[in-house]
């Protein structure tokens, strides 16, 4: 078994694994490590973990050292450089009349690369912009176009629940969220009700989906033909949490409320999005 630690390079970023070697590493410590982008400084987010080495396709790199006072000074200088680079890049974008919005700038610890994150509605030819930035900063320049979900994660904000965005508070990685989840959970398919500030489906739709899927396995769906104590009918409404169904009776069109355990399913239905729903919700899925 290999002893590892987990390191984050952003406050709510993905966790990467490293070998602590002989260092006494604690939660929250700053460590210097080598990554695909070069030498970086990250914060320890996991400690005292042991994992089978065969789970890793590549050898686990060891940390270079615990961050020193001089390393922390370097980080402060890099933060200031990022602020200056942001202002200069905005000026260059305006000068080139490019239709793009600068979101964030990141300077690698070894000062070997500047990364500029931006959003744009379409593809942008930024080759001349890269040349200008390289001439100013004399280092490698990388421009990276991000989606609206990543933009929300970087900028932060408050959701309709009044809480800080999940993505900028604790979600290390985005999970796929689909309109089918909202449909299965019986939520209103009004886009303003189920989409976040980013304009995509709210990440929290994913949190209870497993529980709803388990309930759906044992509950008739809307449109199912069932047999009740009063006769046959069609399920018009389902409350998965209470286990109660509204059933329209065949014999007199009356609607009765029954418990799912008190009926017999003759023919079940499936949950489908109709054409109008698909059209209205187009664009809510994706990045």
Predicted regions and their residues:
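Conserved glycine-centered short motifs in functionally critical loops
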Residues: 159-228, 236
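Short, conserved beta-turn/loop elements at beta-strand boundaries and strand-helix junctions
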Residues: 48-52, 238-243
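Short coil-to-beta-strand transition motifs
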Residues: 35-40, 224-232
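Intrinsically disordered, low-complexity linker and terminal regions at domain boundaries
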Residues: 257-287
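Short beta-strands and strand-coil junctions in structured, solvent-facing domains, enriched
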Residues: 14-15, 123-125, 235, 244, ...
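Basic/aromatic-rich interaction segments and small domains that mediate binding to polyanionic partners
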Residues: 239-260
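Acidic-enriched and Gly/Ser
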Residues: 1-191
């Amino acid at each position: 078994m290999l002893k590892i630690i987990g390191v984050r390079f952003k406050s709510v970023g993905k966790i990467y694994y490293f070998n602590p070697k002989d260092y006494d590493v604690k939660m929250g410590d700053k460590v210097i490590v080598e990554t695909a982008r070069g030498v970086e400084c990250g914060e320890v987010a996991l400690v005292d973990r042991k994992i089978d080495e065969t789970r890793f396709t590549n050898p686990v790199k060891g940390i270079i050292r615990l961050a020193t006072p001089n390393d922390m000074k370097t980080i402060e200088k890099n933060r200031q450089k990022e602020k200056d680079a942001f202002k200069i890049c905005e000026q260059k974008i305006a000068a080139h009349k490019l239709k793009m919005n600068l979101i964030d700038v990141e300077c690698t610890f070894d000062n070997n690369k500047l990364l500029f994150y931006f959003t744009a509605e379409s593809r942008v030819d930024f080759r001349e912009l890269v040349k200008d930035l390289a001439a100013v900063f004399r280092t490698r320049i990388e421009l990276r176009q991000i989606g609206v979900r990543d933009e929300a994660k970087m900028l932060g904000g408050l959701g309709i629940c009044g809480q800080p965005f999940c993505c900028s508070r604790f979600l290390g990685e985005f999970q796929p969220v689909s309109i089918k989840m909202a449909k299965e959970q019986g939520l209103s398919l009004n886009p303003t009700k189920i989409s976040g500030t980013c304009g995509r489906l709210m990440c929290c739709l994913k949190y209870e989906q497993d529980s709803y899927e388990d309930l759906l396995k044992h509950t008739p769906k809307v449109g199912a033909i069932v047999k009740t104590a009063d006769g046959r009918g069609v399920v018009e409404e389902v409350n998965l949490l209470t286990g109660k169904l509204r059933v329209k009776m065949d014999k007199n069109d009356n609607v009765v409320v029954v418990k799912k355990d008190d009926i017999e399913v003759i023919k079940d239905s499936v949950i489908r999005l109709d054409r109008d729903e698909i059209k209205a919700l187009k664009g809510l899925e994706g990045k």
